[in-house]
Amino acid sequence: MEKFRAVLDLHVKHHSALGYGLVTLLTAGGERIFSAVAFQCPCSAAWNLPYGLVFLLVPALALFLLGYVLSARTWRLLTGCCSSARASCGSALRGSLVCTQISAAAALAPLTWVAVALLGGAFYECAATGSAAFAQRLCLGRNRSCAAELPLVPCNQAKASDVQDLLKDLKAQSQVLGWILIAVVIIILLIFTSVTRCLSPVSFLQLKFWKIYLEQEQQILKSKATEHATELAKENIKCFFEGSHPKEYNTPSMKEWQQISSLYTFNPKGQYYSMLHKYVNRKEKTHSIRSTEGDTVIPVLGFVDSSGINSTPEL
């Protein structure tokens, strides 16, 4: 588990270099292995359709949910949201914008799974041959036994040669759908990235500086938090065995932790690179930084919430 966590931390730390290419390659490779080892079409009129759809869609759903679980923004949004101390979790619009961004990022792996599965064709062939609607369309103008033998096509057990030849048509349909899905995803991703960059309130070089600042801030925060926690633990253990009272340590309160753990919002009136930066520059100690007039969620700045003392959630 520790090795697995180290790999995840490495991916989070160097996500700009690794990008989503690693996720795509791992998903594609996993689908190919899964298809070759676990998938065996039953070649039954009753089971082909549900069996093919389950193998095509259920792993995609699992990957989508896993994308939510591994997103630091998900837990920033949800942690403490239902407690009485945080009855209000921000405006519905702001929350929906963040959820949309999280969903878009989480959709990469499942879309890759579906696209690679369609290019392979096995899942689609199995599901299509078990559909009565597909059977009517595919068997149009063929002999009467076509519909009955169609479920046997994925296993190469159809007696009529013209029926068995439908396997080539099904594979072609599946691969065309796969390439269409890939093209649509790339076009949407390109448009979304271009629009978010176009609407960015900060320049290209400032974004680079921003990411450098966040990396340094989180490294120093983790180092300081580890040092403070170690000293506090040593003091408490020492006092426990000696029966003495511990000396006072200035540890941030629950409210202060909640302030810097909230989702980042951009405000043109103040140039803050993180919620911690915003908190230490507040005008009054009792002033809340969670919601201020003019605060907005900027898609291109979503990376701010992806950083943390340990961005990989506890598994």
UniProtKB/Swiss-Prot annotation:
It catalyses: ATP(in) = ATP(out). Placenta. Pfam families: Ca_hom_mod (PF14798). It is found in: Cell membrane. Its main location: membrane. GO terms for cellular component: immunological synapse; plasma membrane. Pore-forming subunit of an ATP-permeable channel. In response to pathogen-derived and proinflammatory stimuli, relocates from intracellular compartments to NK-dendritic cell and NK-macrophage immune synapses where it mediates ATP efflux and NK cell activation involved in antimicrobial and antitumor responses. May assemble to form gap junction channel-like structures with gating and ion conductance likely regulated by membrane lipids and voltage rather than by extracellular calcium levels. PANTHER family: CALCIUM HOMEOSTASIS MODULATOR PROTEIN (PTHR32261), CALCIUM HOMEOSTASIS MODULATOR PROTEIN 6 (PTHR32261:SF4). Belongs to the CALHM family. This is Calcium homeostasis modulator protein 6. The gene is CALHM6.
